[in-house]
Amino acid sequence: MRGAAGALMDGAVRDIKAIRAMNFPVFHGGIGPLDTKGRGRVMAIDVPVRCAGVKVARGDLIFGDADGVVVVPQAVEAQVLALAFDKIKGEKRTLDDLRAGQKLGYVFAKYGIL
């Protein structure tokens, strides 16, 4: 793993039980029985690639969870993170108002997020 935090695959993986036992997150397009023996080869190293049609380059942030994966290009990282933290703050205010008894329609009109 050499310091990797996880792996993003544009296709199926196998040996999923072993991968899960490693506690190493792997985001993939499915599970299948085939290996790459005789079919796989290294074409290039450390070059931009496309994964599910999205460009992924060295230095990009990749966030993944049970709901999916998002790639944040390094060039807009600061802007995207600032917007994400603003959204989290807004969601917290929304939740606080709902817990305080405010109606959903009012809270949505006030903040524009749920």
Description of each model-found segment:
Residues 62-63:
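Generic structural signal for buried aliphatic residues
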Residues 68-70:
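Channel- or pocket-lining gating/hinge segments that regulate access to a cavity or pore
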